[in-house]
């Protein structure tokens, strides 16, 4: 994401006159920005030589320009990236423009008996007051392009603020998880929920519950557990949980003889070939008499 953003930021800013652009869409609360990228541009260059690659690029440029309306601005960026700004249109106009451009490109290259197939990804945002800065526009636009690149064929993604917020939240949590693991699991905490025998009113079992603190808030388990499993970071964290729970259990045995401890394990952990050996190794570290 950072590559396109950093390389083209100044170029875009100088070309379109950002101050005038922002004055326009703040007043109208309308308009859109559309960034497009040819996915297989490296393959076009290296498998068909530069001459054909230049032809494809110039063809795309012609198709874009021929599809533009009067008040739409076009900028050719680096690495086969193209940007279109419209100060009056909306999301539907952006989608229709992309469809028009891709249809035009397909028709032109088919007429020329194209030698290689490629697809185009496009990310779009509706310009509104929530985009309060130039950097914000580019950040969200580039986010949309990256999302579009995850689809197949010619693909279009319209920026969704709620989707963006959710993904940024995940990124923030995952970044904190990496930090915590690399700092001796700082921020991870274990709480022990007692299970009581209703007849004797005594604690017979404890269940270990994993919690994660990030700055001044506790992250909901449903937010961070799935991230741990998806990234397989559940393996180092899970080992820490088992070891910490066993250490606590050993100490509590002195106060409550016969106390049991339940520790949940993820399928990712259980599915590891060495999961049983890992448990044995942890027990050996704590107290071999427990074996």
What are the residue ranges of the model-derived segments?
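Conserved long alpha-helical elements within nucleotide-processing catalytic cores of c-di-GMP signaling
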Residues: 2-32, 39-65, 75-79, 91-99, ...
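Active-site core of bacterial EAL-family cyclic-dinucleotide phosphodiesterase domains
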Residues: 4, 17-20, 169-227, 264
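Nucleotide second-messenger and two-component phosphorelay signaling modules
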Residues: 4, 20-32, 36-39, 47-51, ...
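Alpha-helical scaffold within the catalytic cores of cyclic-nucleotide enzymes
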Residues: 61-68, 93-111, 139-142, 241-250
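Cyclic nucleotide signaling catalytic output domains
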Residues: 74, 100, 121-130, 136-151, ...
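Catalytic core regions of nucleotide second-messenger enzymes
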Residues: 75-78, 105-121, 149, 217, ...
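Catalytic strand-loop-helix junctions within cyclic-nucleotide turnover domains
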Residues: 85-94, 112-137, 162-166, 194-200, ...
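Catalytic core of bacterial c-di-GMP phosphodiesterases, primarily the EAL and HD-GYP domains
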Residues: 202-206, 233-291
């Amino acid at each position: 994401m950072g590559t396109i953003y950093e390389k083209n930021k100044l170029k875009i800013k100088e070309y379109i006159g950002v101050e005038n652009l922002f004055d326009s869409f703040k007043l109208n609360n309308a308009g859109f920005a559309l960034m497009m990228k040819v996915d297989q541009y490296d393959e076009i260059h290296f498998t068909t030589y530069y001459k054909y690659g230049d032809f494809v690029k110039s063809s795309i440029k012609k198709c874009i320009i021929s599809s533009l309306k009067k008040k739409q601005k076009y900028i050719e960026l680096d690495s086969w990236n193209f940007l279109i700004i419209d100060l009056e249109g909306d999301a539907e106009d952006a989608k229709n423009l992309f469809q028009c451009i891709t249809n035009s490109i397909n028709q032109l290259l088919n007429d020329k008996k194209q030698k290689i197939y490629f697809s185009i990804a496009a990310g779009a945002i509706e310009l509104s007051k929530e985009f309060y800065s130039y950097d914000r526009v580019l950040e969200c636009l580039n986010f949309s392009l990256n999302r579009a690149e995850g689809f197949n064929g010619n693909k279009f993604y319209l920026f969704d603020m709620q989707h963006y917020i959710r993904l940024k939240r995940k990124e923030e949590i995952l970044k904190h998880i990496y930090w915590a693991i690399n700092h001796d699991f700082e921020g991870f905490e274990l709480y022990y929920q007692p299970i009581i025998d209703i007849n004797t009113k005594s604690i017979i079992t404890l269940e270990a519950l994993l919690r994660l603190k990030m700055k001044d808030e506790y992250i909901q388990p449903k937010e961070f557990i799935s991230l741990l499993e998806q990234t397989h970071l559940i393996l180092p964290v899970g080992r820490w949980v088992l070891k910490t729970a066993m250490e606590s259990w050993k100490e509590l045995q002195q106060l409550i003889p016969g106390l049991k401890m339940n520790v949940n394990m993820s399928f990712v952990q259980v599915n590891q070939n060495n999961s049983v050996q890992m448990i044995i190794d942890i027990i050996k570290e704590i107290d071999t008499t427990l074996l």
